[in-house]
Amino acid sequence: MRKLRETIHIYHTNDLHSHLENWPSIHHFLSERRKKHASDSSLILDIGDHVDRSNIYTEGTLGRGNVKLLNDAQYDYATIGNNEGITLSHEELDSLYEQAKFEVIVSNFTDLEGNIPRWVKPYKIHQTASGIRIGIIAATADYSVYYEKLGWRLQDPLPRLQA
């Protein structure tokens, strides 16, 4: 059996809550890291609560401006937090990621009929150029009562992550 050896850089953001005054610094940092480690593999993830409607840009674009920022920074994957999930209507959330150039991973999220939305993947096996496989999993916090009022269903995150 051949041994694979590779350096993998994993960067993530979380809980930005649309504090976009920090975004130029974050974007610059991630861009510089990708350049610095161009010969290695790297992943950039947002692990939820990027969107917060308290920001006028986010409110005015219904979060689509946030998705554009993630696209521009070349994110690979994202998941949703409660700010994406329960502050946007069903229709707004269902269309939020239409222009995303990254994949949205959420293992415990469906519509009320149990269907996984077209923009969601419950998990992803990411393969690097040298063949190393990395499992990408994510779940959002179980605020079931609020999600169900908006036409979504959440499962208990722990069993979904263990599945």
Predicted features along the sequence, with ranges:
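Acidic, metal/ion-coordinating pockets
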Residues: 1-163
